[in-house]
């Protein structure tokens, strides 16, 4: 089934037809750099689409697990991160949309009793990985004998999570 989460009628029809006990929302426009040039896509998919899912859960399902992002930690310099750390300084529109999801889920939980769990995934890698992510870019550069392009002078530190670990943790 292919469905656009910004299409509320189609989404609500799916909820009505399927009678979900739990919803796991992994739909989002991902990527920090892309959000700079395509902000509308992020607001429509990550905010409006998520709102539609919350509205459908409000009326048709009371449990929602959803993907947030490590990018909500923004300018937080403490390492390692903790789920109680402040997340009020996003550094990209993508991060702001994911923080918005967390706030919206909290409100729907408080107002309507929906059980919500947001999972702050760190960079996910593995088979079928996104072609714009560093593991794929680095592997392609190495196999093609090209130099690896680094950002921030190569001083960046990044946590990666293997897709199978994400699946186990989410389920």
Describe each PLM feature range.
Residues 78-80, 103-171:
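NAD(P)-dependent short-chain dehydrogenase/reductase
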Residues 1-124, 164:
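N-terminal Rossmann-like NAD(P)+-binding domain of SDR-like oxidoreductases, especially those catalyzing
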């Amino acid at each position: 089934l292919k469905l656009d989460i910004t299409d509320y009628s189609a989404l609500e029809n799916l909820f009505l037809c399927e009678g979900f006990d739990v919803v796991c929302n992994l739909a989002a426009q991902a990527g920090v750099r892309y959000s700079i040039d395509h902000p509308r896509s992020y607001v429509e998919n990550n905010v409006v689409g998520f709102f539609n899912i919350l509205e459908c859960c409000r009326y048709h399902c009371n449990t929602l697990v959803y993907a947030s992002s490590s990018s909500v930690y923004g300018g937080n310099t403490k390492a390692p991160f903790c789920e109680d750390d402040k997340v009020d300084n996003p550094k990209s529109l993508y991060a702001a949309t994911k923080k918005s999801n967390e706030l919206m889920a909290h409100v729907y939980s408080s107002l309507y009793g929906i059980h919500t769990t947001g999972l702050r995934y760190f960079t996910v890698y593995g088979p079928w990985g996104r072609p714009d992510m560093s593991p794929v870019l680095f592997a392609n550069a190495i196999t093609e004998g090209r130099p690896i392009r680094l950002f921030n002078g190569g001083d960046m530190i990044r946590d990666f999570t293997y897709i199978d670990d994400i699946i186990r943790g989410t389920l």
